[in-house]
Swiss-Prot record:
Note: When isolated from the sequence, the neuroprotective peptide provides neuroprotection at subfemtomolar concentrations against toxicity associated with tetrodoxin (electrical blockade), the amyloid-beta peptide (the Alzheimer disease neurotoxin), N-methyl-aspartate (excitotoxicity), and the human immunideficiency virus (HIV) envelope protein.
Tagged with keyword Ribonucleoprotein: no
Protein's UniProt name: Activity-dependent neuroprotector homeobox protein
Region Disordered, residue ranges: 133-154, 360-438, 690-711, 851-1037, 1050-1108
Keywords: Acetylation, Chromosome, DNA-binding, Homeobox, Isopeptide bond, Metal-binding, Methylation, Nucleus, Phosphoprotein, Repeat, Transcription, Transcription regulation, Ubl conjugation, Zinc, Zinc-finger
Residues with PTM N6-acetyllysine: K1041, K1048
Database matches in SUPFAM superfamilies: Homeodomain-like (SSF46689)
Amino acid sequence: MFQLPVNNLGSLRKARKTVKKILSDIGLEYCKEHIEDFKQFEPNDFYLKNTTWEDVGLWDPSLTKNQDYRTKPFCCSACPFSSKFFSAYKSHFRNVHSEDFENRILLNCPYCTFNADKKTLETHIKIFHAPNSSAPSSSLSTFKDKNKNDGLKPKQADNVEQAVYYCKKCTYRDPLYEIVRKHIYREHFQHVAAPYIAKAGEKSLNGAVSLGTNAREECNIHCKRCLFMPKSYEALVQHVIEDHERIGYQVTAMIGHTNVVVPRAKPLMLIAPKPQDKKGMGLPPRISSLASGNVRSLPSQQMVNRLSIPKPNLNSTGVNMMSNVHLQQNNYGVKSVGQSYGVGQSVRLGLGGNAPVSIPQQSQSVKQLLPSGNGRSFGLGAEQRPPAAARYSLQTANTSLPPGQVKSPSVSQSQASRVLGQSSSKPPPAATGPPPSNHCATQKWKICTICNELFPENVYSVHFEKEHKAEKVPAVANYIMKIHNFTSKCLYCNRYLPTDTLLNHMLIHGLSCPYCRSTFNDVEKMAAHMRMVHIDEEMGPKTDSTLSFDLTLQQGSHTNIHLLVTTYNLRDAPAESVAYHAQNNAPVPPKPQPKVQEKADVPVKSSPQAAVPYKKDVGKTLCPLCFSILKGPISDALAHHLRERHQVIQTVHPVEKKLTYKCIHCLGVYTSNMTASTITLHLVHCRGVGKTQNGQDKTNAPSRLNQSPGLAPVKRTYEQMEFPLLKKRKLEEDADSPSCFEEKPEEPVVLALDPKGHEDDSYEARKSFLTKYFNKQPYPTRREIEKLAASLWLWKSDIASHFSNKRKKCVRDCEKYKPGVLLGFNMKELNKVKHEMDFDAEWLFENHDEKDSRVNASKTVDKKHNLGKEDDSFSDSFEHLEEESNGSGSPFDPVFEVEPKIPSDNLEEPVPKVIPEGALESEKLDQKEEEEEEEEEDGSKYETIHLTEEPAKLMHDASDSEVDQDDVVEWKDGASPSESGPGSQQISDFEDNTCEMKPGTWSDESSQSEDARSSKPAAKKKATVQDDTEQLKWKNSSYGKVEGFWSKDQSQWENASENAERLPNPQIEWQNSTIDSEDGEQFDSMTDGVADPMHGSLTGVKLSSQQA
C-alpha cells in the first residue's frame, strides 16, 4: 500500500525508535519464555547449517541497506527512487522497470487520494467505493421521493475532495495523469504532429486525424519520417513530440494537479433482478410498456455517479456489482444490435444525456437482453433545453417522444452510442464518431468544472457546449507577442510571460475592443460592453496569434466566457493589420443558416475591404527597444523608428522562428532575446556601416523618404560628446578660430586619411594609423570618430582618448621646450586682430603709410637684379635676422615688400631697400617728424652711396665666396661655422613654404612702450654724425634702414659703429650685439647659421664702399 508523506519526521522517528526498542524487548522476552515449549519442534543442526535466508524469504536483510524514509508522494517499491511529480515517477518506471510497467506502477484512485498498483487499486475500489445495492425499491413513490431528496439536493456531507489532474490550456480534468496527457496530445498538439502524419491509403490535407476515426483508420496512420506505425493517434503524437520534436517538457508543463469537490458515491438504484426476471431494474412492469407517455428517469447525478467508474483498466473485478444489470430498450432508448457478443465482450449503451457506460457482458447476450420485439426507441433529450439548466445527463422528465424517432429493430451496432446525438443542432465529430467495440480499455473521462459531473470524453464536449456554452468575447492586445503556446512577450515591458500569468498582465495594460478601440481592465466590463454595443458584430477568423482563455465569472450564477485575445501577428505586420481583422469591418447582419455564414466568412481575411492595413490605424505605440512613445500610424512609425533610431528592421529568426531584428547595414539577424545594448555593441563592429556611408549619398535610400527634421540621422546619435574632446573644442573655439564646429549630419564624412585596409591590422598598427591621422587632423569631429571606430574596429572612447592624449602631449612639449616659430609676425595684420600679447620696446614696429613708403622707395632700389642668385641668401639672411630680433613666432606669414627700381641721375649701383610689412603698424606716429628727419638725411645719403662698376664686381665675388669666408672667419661667440650650410638651407625652405605652427606658449613677450619711440631719434642723430662711409652705407642700405624701423637701445648702436671702425670684421660684432640672449641656447646655433650668408653679403658691400 502507498503511504502518504508524513510531517515532523524528527519527532516521529525518535518515538518510533523507542517503540521499536520496546517491541523488540517484548518479543525477546516472549521468545525466552516459550523457547522451552518449541524445542521439540526445533530441527537438527544439519538443517540449520544448510539453510539460508533465501530459503526462508526472498529478501535478505544483510544484503540491503536501510533506506531513509522517503517523504515524496511517489515512491518506487523496487528501488530507492521517489519523486514529487507523477510524470517523473512514471518516466522512471518506464525507463528502469519497463518489464512489468502496467502491473507495478502506482495509479491514482479516482475517488480519493489513495495510490496503488493496478490489482490493489481494483480491490480498493471494490471495497471502499463500490455502491451499495441494498436500496429499497418497493414502490415507485418511495423511489421518487428518495430521488428528490438525495439526488436533486445533495447535502454538504455528501461531498468529498477528489485529486485530479487538469489541462492548463482548457477545462479538461481527469484523475489519471495518462488520460490528461493523451488529451493534450490529441487536442493541443495536432499542429505539431500534422507534418509527420501520413495515411497508408490516402493523404489528408494537413495530416491531422479526426477524433472520430475508428480503430481501423487509426492503425493505418504512420510517421512520415521514420515510418513508425502506432496503435493510436495519441501514440503517434507522443512519438512525434518525444522523438522528433523533443518538446515533451511542454506537455508536462501543461498538466496541473489539484483537488476538486465531487459528490460522494451513493448506492446504485438499479437492483439486479432474479435470473428468471427479464424486465429487471426493480421497476413496475407498467413502466416498460409505455409507448408515448411520460418517462421518469433517475436523477442525473445519481445515475452518473453510480454507473461511471472512470478506470479504463478495470475489466471485471471492479464492477462485479454490475454483472447482472439488465437494461430494457423502452426505458433508456437503447437500440437493438444486429449481432451477439460473447462472454467478456463489452458494449457501449447510450444512456440519456449522451453518457454511455461500458458494461461487461456475461453469459447473456445482447439479443437476449434487448429483444427485437420492442421496436420503439426513445431519443431522449431531443428537445432544446434552456441554457440555464444545471444538469444534462438523463434529464428526460415530461419529455414527449415524437413519432418520427421510431426506429426499426434491425439497426447497426455503430448507432448504439448515438442515442442522444440528435439533441444538438451540429454535434462535433467527437459525439458522432462511432467508437470501436473494444475501446472500453482506453475510455477517457472528464469532470465538468462547473457542475462537477463526470462524463466520458466524447460526451463532455457536447455537454459543455449545450449546458455551459461560453460567451465568446474578442479582444485585442497589440503589445503581446505570442512566442509559442506557453510563452508570450510583452512589448511594453520587454519581458517574457508564462501562460498562467499572461491574462493578469494583459489586464494591467488593458484589453482593447476590436471594433471601437475602447480599453478595459476588467473582463466582466468588457463582456458587458460587447453585449451592449457590439452584439451583432461578426468576429474575424481565428489566427495563429490568437490567445484563448476559458473563464468563469461569479455573477450570482456561473457565466462562462471564452476570451479570444488577438496579439501581435508577425505575418500580417506591417502590411496588414496586426490587430483583429474585423476591427474596422462594417457590421454584417447575421444570417439564419450558420453553414452559409461560415462559407461567407472564409474570404474575409483575403478581401481588401475587410482587412484594413494596420498602418492606417493612427494612435500611440511603444518602441520595444528604447520604450519611446511613437505617434502616428502605428506600423509606419514603429518601422521608421526602428530603422532610423536603432538601424534595424523586423524579421523572423530563421532557426528560432521568433520575432527578432535584422541590421540594415550588414543584414545580420539578431537573436530573439536581444536588447538595445546588443545593437549598440554590434554597430561598433559592423563592417557594413562604413561601406554604407563611405562617400555615398543616402538621400535616395528608402530610409530617407519620409525623414523629418526632428528625427535622428541614420547613425544612432548621442547627445553628449566625449568630455576631453568637448572641452578642447570649446577652448579652441573661444580663441579666434575661423572654422565652425557645426556640421550637417546629412553630408558624408570625409576623412583626412583613408582607413581602408587597416581593420585587420594589429592593435598597435591601428594606433599608429590614428597617430598619422592626428598629424593631419588633430581635432576630428564626432562623426569622424564614429567612422574611424567603425572602420578600424575600435571603441570610440579609445579613439577620442588617443587624440586627446596626443593634444595634451603637444601642449606639454610646447611648455617644456619653449619652441619658437622662425617666421616673424605680420604686424600689419596682427594689429588688425584683437589680442592680449604684450611686446617689449625693442620689438616695437612702426606703421608707415603708402606715401612714406614711396618716398623711401626713391632712396633705395632693388638689389636682387644686380646681385643675381647670390642675393637670395642675402634676403634670406635679412629675413632670419628679423626672426632673431623678434625671438618668437606668430601664426601669420611675413610679407616682404620689395620696392621697384628708380633710376637716379648718377651712375649708382642699385642697393636693395627691403621694407618688411610686418614692421608696419595700424597706428601712425608723428609723420611730420619723420619727414623732417628724412629730408635732412637725403643729401648725405645720395652723395655717399655712389658706387662704381668695380665695387659691384667685388660684391659679386664676395657673394660667391661667402661660404668660404664663413669657414675661415673665427667666430667670437664660439658658434660653429659649419652650421651655416644647414642654416641657409633652412632659410630657403622657410622662404618657399609656409611654416607649420605649434600651439603653445610664446617664449618672449613684448610691450609697446613710449621709451622705444624716444630712443629712435637719438639713434638716428648718432648715425648722421658718423662720417665714415661705412656708417653711411648702413644708413642708406636696407640694413641701415632697419635702424629706422627697429628701435634699439642707443648704446647697442654705438658699440656697433665703434666695432665697425676698429675690427676687420665689424659685422660679427654687430651680429653679436643684436642676438637676443633670451631665445634659449637651442636656437644659438640656428641663429649663427642664419647669419652666415648675411655677413658674407655685408662684407661685399663694405669692401665696395671702402674701395670707392
